[in-house]
Amino acid sequence: CIDCFEEDKVFVPEPSWKMNKHNFGWFKGDTVNMGVGQGYLVSTPIQLAKYAYIMANKGKFSDLSLKKDLVKSEKNIEFNKFSNDDWFKLHESMVNVIEGNTGTARRLRERKNYIVAAKTGTAELVSGDNREQYSDTRLDDSLRDHALIIAFGPMPNPRYAVSVVVENGESGGSGAGPVATS
């Protein structure tokens, strides 16, 4: 889908993988985690931008290119056909990440004069039992979580989709969000 070989390979775990790798069955919680981009899902920033583009265009996708001039793709793909109401709810939820009073990137609201839909994220570098040994104030800078955000806009007719990863940025809303909306 992009002129980089490895960008076509997305690791999406499934029950048989988990059983072989961890000797545990698949739990409903694994599905919930996958739905919000957590758990065992592995993707690159370019793949995240592709997901944002697909959501912005309500399931429609054209190939990406790193070429200097925009090349119109002849290959258009349409993913899972959600209802218009489903797409509205998805877009509304992502807009509320910034525009909502409890959104994880609500502090970005004042930084712009347009509406953006977003999903913030964090890639943990210290996990499980090791994480409990550290407080964020004592954690070495190189071990702080990576900050992520995917976004598209301006709403309601998005023209741009982005993904931003800030190494050791700690929080998607405060670490990666300002980069995405600038």
What are these regions (language model features)?
Residues 112, 167-182:
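Periplasmic/cell-envelope proteins involved in peptidoglycan metabolism and beta-lactam response
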Residues 1-164:
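Beta-lactam-recognizing serine transpeptidase/beta-lactamase-like catalytic domain environment
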